[in-house]
Amino acid sequence: MLPTLDVSDIPAARATMKELRAGLPVPDETGISVTDVTVPGPAGAPDVTLRIYRPDEVTGPIGIYDVHGGGFILGDIDASHAGNVALARAVGAVVVTVEYRLAPEAPFPAPLEDAYAGLVWFAEHAADYGVEPARIAIHGISAGGGLCAGLALLARDRGGPAIAFQYLGVPEVDDRLTTPSMTAFTDTPIWNRPNAIVSWDSYLGEGVPGSADVSPYAAPARATDLSGLPPAYVSTMAFDPLRDEGIAYGLALLAAGVPVELHLFPGTFHGSTLIEGAAISQREITERVAVLRRALGV
């Protein structure tokens, strides 16, 4: 049974997620060295914590920079720990994940700038971990996918770091909340329209979502120039309010000349990969690994 997620009370939702995580088995870290480092944050902001996963058996000098999900308001590097252990092992890559500040306490641009600061550090220190700076992919699910899309735009416009590939899993990229799937899916598991409203109000400030002044770095669906971005993979789920914005963003990337692979998984909903035994979940997980390995040239 999947947990019900209601983010109308953000502190309560965070506490619930922490309790659920406490009941999960500890991941097997055999063959993976895990270290936390503190790196400079954005100018005038606190330092940022990165967690680095380095497999004993790597498939090449490749790296993955992970940005966790959670609607901009939930999650941390502990919540994504098991997934990143598995990702590092399966891909055979060094995985670095970032502890970014959360909204509403730290609204846009704080989470994105934290993620950018961490990416800059990883690119500058990649060789210390046996990674070629030109072979780093960014990877995020849900709000993490939205942050990765914003990160790709920011890195392009600031002249770096170079990003080899962007993996955008069920990305949260459009604050306007007007797509057919966002309008229709008001009570779907884990993520739904009411949760999306809280998410964007928290990230941008109440009354700002849907207005004319929203930055494309915050809501990449707003971007009018997607040229020059790294190749992308965009996944969407059939019964997910984020479905249509993900599809639209993938098609917009394609129209801008960006190589894109766009995938809709049938019979799925937001977070349905938590049902790990389902065949479609195994297919999605297997494809994620294959996509990243292929994109990074291994």
Please give the residue ranges for each predicted region.
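Proline/glycine-enriched tight loop/beta-turn segments at coil->beta junctions
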Residues: G44-V48, P55-G63, L226-L229
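Hydrolase active-site cap/lid region
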Residues: L153-S211
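Gly/Ser-rich "nucleophile elbow"/oxyanion-hole loop immediately N-terminal to the catalytic nucleophile
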Residues: A123-I138, R158
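Short amphipathic alpha-helix adjacent to the substrate-entry channel of hydrolases
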Residues: D78-V98
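Short beta-strand/loop motif that positions the catalytic acidic residue
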Residues: V234-T236
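Alpha/beta-hydrolase active-site loop
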Residues: A106-D128, R288
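A glycine/proline-hinged amphipathic helix-loop "lid/cap" segment
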Residues: M1-P55, P209-G210, A290-V298
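Gly/Ala-rich beta-loop-alpha elbow adjacent to hydrolase catalytic centers
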Residues: G140, G144, C148
